Amino acid sequence: MGLEERLPGGILLSTVEKVAGYVRKGSLWPATFGLACCAIEMMATAGPRFDISRFGMERFSATPRQADLMIVAGRVSQKMAPVLRQIYDQMAEPKWVLAMGVCASSGGMFNNYAVVQGVDHVVPVDIYLPGCPPRPEMLLHAILKLHDKIQQMPLGVNREEAIREAERAALAVTPTIELKGLLR
């Protein structure tokens, strides 16, 4: 069944936001920020068995100025946090962040002064991917979920307000090291 059969009268109705979302999700260029063992699984995802290129991501960018997706794979030390933020700030809009692994998401088993307890304390995170380390299939699933999120993202002023709100929410979260609960 071709496109002609799906479109009544050959007319396609859509909005600019939906078309832009469709185009953006098919051409993500990730900037790798591999810091630990999760980076090995991220590299395996780019191999021939899992083939991330079928989602338009065949090129991992070494420079942040050409990337629009940052995959933070592994734990982030306190000394690496300013570098991570600088790389994020150098990325062009629109940009998205995927926290890959439990260490990037919440600090993992490294609950000490030297490790940031979650990348969301440094940059706003769009997708959290749990696991130690997460399998390549899980990374592909997270990328597909990010595609769904990109498809629904607003454009222009609405997007800028959504980004500011996400940044405020991320900065307002209580750091994990200060939380009280069963383990403290």
From Swiss-Prot:
It is an enzyme of class 7 (translocase). GO terms for biological process: aerobic respiration; electron transport coupled proton transport. It is found in: Cell membrane. It is a peripheral membrane protein. Binds 1 [4Fe-4S] cluster. One of its GO terms (cellular component) is plasma membrane. It catalyses: a quinone + NADH + 5 H(+)(in) = a quinol + NAD(+) + 4 H(+)(out). Its cofactor is [4Fe-4S] cluster. Keywords: 4Fe-4S, Cell membrane, Iron, Iron-sulfur, Membrane, Metal-binding, NAD, Quinone, Translocase, Transport. GO terms for molecular function: 4 iron, 4 sulfur cluster binding; iron ion binding; NADH dehydrogenase (ubiquinone) activity; NADH:ubiquinone reductase (non-electrogenic) activity; quinone binding. [4Fe-4S] cluster binds at residues 37-38, 103, 132. InterPro entries: NADH_UbQ_OxRdtase-like_20kDa, NADH_UQ_OxRdtase_20Kd_su. Its EC number is 7.1.1.-. Its main location: membrane. Belongs to the complex I 20 kDa subunit family. NDH-1 shuttles electrons from NADH, via FMN and iron-sulfur (Fe-S) centers, to quinones in the respiratory chain. The immediate electron acceptor for the enzyme in this species is believed to be a menaquinone. Couples the redox reaction to proton translocation (for every two electrons transferred, four hydrogen ions are translocated across the cytoplasmic membrane), and thus conserves the redox energy in a proton gradient. NDH-1 is composed of 14 different subunits. Subunits NuoB, C, D, E, F, and G constitute the peripheral sector of the complex. This is NADH-quinone oxidoreductase subunit B. It comes from Mycolicibacterium vanbaalenii (strain DSM 7251 / JCM 13017 / BCRC 16820 / KCTC 9966 / NRRL B-24157 / PYR-1) (Mycobacterium vanbaalenii). The lineage of its organism: Bacteria, Bacillati, Actinomycetota, Actinomycetes, Mycobacteriales.
